Amino acid sequence: MAEKLNPNATLLAIDKSEKRQKFTLENFQKRNLSYEVKTALPEDIKGSFDLVLADVPCSNTGVCCKRPDSILRFSAKDLASITKIQKQILEEAARLTNSNGQLIYSTCSIEPEENILMVEEFVKNHKDFSLIKYEQLLPTLEHDGAFAALLIKK
């Protein structure tokens, strides 16, 4: 995605995990991308953006072929906890999205509560957003499962 952006674009990586921040920066360096990458917490950010990607923490049920233990460790209590966090992140991502901007919501989950149900509830409660399209990939031996939805802010 970053490779398709305007070369003068500023990328802003928001993640509490220093390990994931480092991983993101390493990926940009591997691809010889010359973007300025900043890390911050959502509450520290002023302004809004044309494109926001919310790749949220999830149950990891989409990686069950690679890590079968992800299914064994998963519980209804975990689902309730993780969906609460996902809603908070989606709310922050919405706040950071410009009018006429795009918001991409993604997980590596196959759980409807984390995916299409989350997005449908969000759009129902945020009349200024429209669901343009979504895709749910189920896990196979060739690839992990994943979900992504494209929302537009009116």
Go through each PLM region and give its residues.
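S-adenosylmethionine
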Residues: 1-154
